[in-house]
Each structure stands twice: as structure tokens, then as C-alpha cells.
């Protein structure tokens, strides 16, 4: 199968892009799929530079680099949205390109045959109206985010409401939202996955001492971990407020992600927990962060799946998430994870953290159950489900 894939970037430091990298590797390797990847940036994925288009059936990933521009996200997206389609039109018109299908992880083009839905901007737009993040307190930033979410919501209306476009959701929650907003009742659930060769209790424990020493965490300190690129959406305000109720306990918080730490440091200072927080930018070696932690906590306000939660589970960490995270549908509350019904419920989060802090045996049992539960989320199974979706779409 000759497949055009459209994504602004691919790497292994962001949830959607990591999932795409794992998928493309397996479609090329396991199903001999010839993938033409139209993207502005590609990292940590083995790709070939296309010299010419041919009718051969050799599987592989061929990167067609699409230029990018600096500036606000909305302008960057508009440029990307139109240019990637122009590049594909040029390749088909003048270079002999031919694609059986066009696949997109989310809203990236108007002509995708299949869209794997990782985030819904209708829902994110609703959340942005309900609360204001400390990282976007300025009027211009709020206006820009509102305009950006509004534009993508209109594109979702146009694309996701079209029954000719095959959709897949990464969680039952996302499938329910697609039905709510677009009346789509034909959406299969294809959950994301975890690579056990990268994330496991054995690998985490082997690096624990070094990872904690690097950050000067003491042996008697319980370290909470939160990973994400939108800390407000991942529930950081709730976690910081919960820390204020654990002042009698030796608890630290490690926050990792591509967000602006300055306003969050200020919030932590106002809450009196600044000395308990460590802020880090994302890196390719994300296992190092899991190795330093004792509990993964992310009471997300909205999360289509929750890759860091799944990776934390695979590492054998007890996890706390919210019912607003897609991964919650796969958890047994109190067995292989803890689920907050309300992501803003600071009191309940503090109580659950206090319970985990005081019961190392419970942490161990829950972490072991979490690791066992994560074993069923494999990238090979994910790729097989997507391949079946591709086959159905190509035969229609």
C-alpha cells in the first residue's frame, strides 16, 4: 500500500508524535507499507529521502520536507495546512506520485481519508473558556489561543462530520466526544501503546539511584512526577494545591515538559511549595524522569489518552489520573491506578497522595498491577488495528 501521511512533525518527545513514529515504523516493517511522510520536522525515526516515485512495493518511510515559518501558532498552522497539500499536489502532478490513501493524526489537511483523533479542539475550546491558565495571562495570548482553537474547531466540523472520512479514536472517551460533537457512531477505538523494551520496572529500578542523585532527591523523599506540554491541562494547578496539604510529609514534585516554567514557579512560590518543585524541559531520555519518581500524578482536565500515564504504569509506578483522561477507561480504580472523578478536586487528590505516601506496600502492589495491565497495550497490536482500518478504507 502507498500511503501519504501528513503531520507537522514527528518525534518521540510528544504523545501524538511518538504514537505516529511507532505506527509508521510498524506499518513499513510489518505490512510492507510504502509511506510518504509530509512533515516539517522528523526526529528519532528512520526515514529515506525520496529520489523518485516508483510503483515498487518496498516498504519504508520516505520524508518529504515541508517548509515552516516562525510566528504565532495560528499563522504557522495556516501555512502548514495549505502548503502540505500543495506539495502533495505538485508530487502527483509533476513527479508521478500516486497514493492509495491519505492518513492524518488529527486535523492537518482537508483531504485525509483516515484521521486518527488524538485531541478534540471543540473540547479544548470549551475548557479555555472555563478557566485561564497561569501561563497565558496576557490578553494577546488568550485571544490567540481562542482564535486558534476556534479555527480548528471549524475544521473539525467540516472534516469529522463527513461520513466519507474514516475516523479512529485513541480511547472510548474520545469516541464518545466524536459522537457528541459530530454524531459519529462508526468510530473504532484504537488505544495508544507502550514499548516494553523502553519502559519496564526493571529498567526504571536499574536507573533509580542515578536519576535521583542527579536531582538531589533524598532516599526518604517521595517524588511525584508529572509530564506534559500543557501543564494546566495536565492538572498541575490541582497538584500544586494538593502539595500545600502535604506540608507535614517529605514530598517532592518533578514537572517535565515543553511549557513555560516561569509563571508556574511563581504560582508555586505563592502557594509556599516552590522549594519542593523541580522543573525540567523534555528530553529524548524520558525514562530518566520515571526512574526518579515514586508516583505518577496527572489529574488531567482533558486528555484523549494519556501516554505518560501509560508509560508510568509500564515502569511499575502507581498512577493517579482523572476521569477526563481517556486512559481512565482502561484502569481499575484502586487496583492498577487511582482515578479522580473531578480533576479540580484538590482535597481528594491530597488524601490519595497521603495514602500512597504512607503505605509503601500499597505503592508496590499498585505499581505491579499497573505494569501487568500495560502489557496489553502493544504497538504491534496498535499497528495491526490501524492496518485493518486502512484495508477497509482502501476497499470502499
List PLM regions with ranges.
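Short, structured helix-loop element that forms part of the nucleotide-activated donor/catalytic region
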Residues: 209, 230, 252-275, 362
Amino acid at each position: 500500500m502507498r500511503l501519504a501521511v501528513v503531520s507537522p512533525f514527528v518525534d518521540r518527545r510528544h504523545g501524538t508524535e511518538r504514537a505516529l513514529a511507532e505506527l509508521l515504523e510498524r506499518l513499513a516493517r510489518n505490512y510492507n507499507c510504502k509511506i510518504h511522510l509530509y512533515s516539517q520536522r522528523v526526529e528519532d525515526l528512520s526515514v529515506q529521502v525520496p529520489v523518485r516515485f516508483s510503483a515498487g512495493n518496498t516498504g519504508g518511510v520516505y520524508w518529504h520536507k515541508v517548509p515552516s515559518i516562525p510566528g504565532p501558532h495560528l499563522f504557522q498552522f495556516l501555512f502548514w495546512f495549505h502548503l502540505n497539500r500543495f506539495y502533495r499536489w505538485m508530487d502527483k502532478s509533476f513527479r508521478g506520485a500516486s497514493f492509495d490513501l491519505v492518513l492524518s493524526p488529527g486535523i492537518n489537511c482537508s483531504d485525509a481519508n483516515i484521521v486518527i483523533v488524538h485531541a478534540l479542539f471543540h473540547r479544548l475550546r470549551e475548557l479555555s473558556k472555563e478557566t485561564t491558565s497561569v501561563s497565558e495571562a496576557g490578553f494577546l495570548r488568550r485571544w490567540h489561543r481562542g482564535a486558534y482553537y476556534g479555527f480548528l474547531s471549524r475544521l473539525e466540523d467540516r472534516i469529522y462530520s463527513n461520513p466519507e472520512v474514516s475516523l479512529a479514536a485513541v480511547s472510548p472517551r474520545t469516541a464518545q466526544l466524536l459522537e457528541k460533537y459530530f454524531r459519529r457512531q462508526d468510530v473504532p477505538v484504537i488505544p495508544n501503546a507502550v514499548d516494553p523494551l523502553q519502559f519496564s520496572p526493571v529498567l526504571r529500578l536499574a536507573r533509580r539511584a542515578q536519576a535521583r542523585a542527579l536531582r538531589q532527591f533524598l532516599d526518604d523523599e517521595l517524588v511525584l512526577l508529572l509530564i506534559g506540554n500543557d501543564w494546566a491541562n495536565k492538572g498541575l494547578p490541582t497538584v500544586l494545591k494538593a502539595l500545600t496539604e502535604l506540608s507535614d510529609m517529605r514530598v517532592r514534585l518533578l514537572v517535565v515538559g515543553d511549557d513555560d516554567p516561569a509563571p508556574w514557579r511563581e504560582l508555586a512560590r505563592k502557594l509556599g511549595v516552590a522549594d519542593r518543585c523541580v522543573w525540567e524541559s523534555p528530553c529524548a531520555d524520558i525514562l530518566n524522569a520515571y526512574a526518579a519518581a515514586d508516583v505518577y500524578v496527572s489529574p488531567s482536565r482533558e486528555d484523549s489518552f494519556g501516554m505518560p500515564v501509560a508509560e508510568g504504569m509500564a515502569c511499575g509506578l502507581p498512577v493517579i489520573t482523572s476521569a477526563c483522561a481517556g486512559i481512565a477507561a482502561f484502569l481499575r480504580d484502586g487496583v492498577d491506578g487511582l482515578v479522580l472523578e473531578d480533576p479540580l478536586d484538590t482535597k481528594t487528590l491530597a488524601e490519595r497522595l497521603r495514602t500512597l505516601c504512607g503505605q509503601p506496600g500499597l505503592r508496590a502492589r499498585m505499581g505491579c498491577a499497573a505494569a501487568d495491565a500495560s502489557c496489553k497495550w502493544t504497538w504491534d497490536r496498535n499497528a495491526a488495528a490501524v492496518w485493518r482500518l486502512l484495508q477497509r478504507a482502501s476497499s470502499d
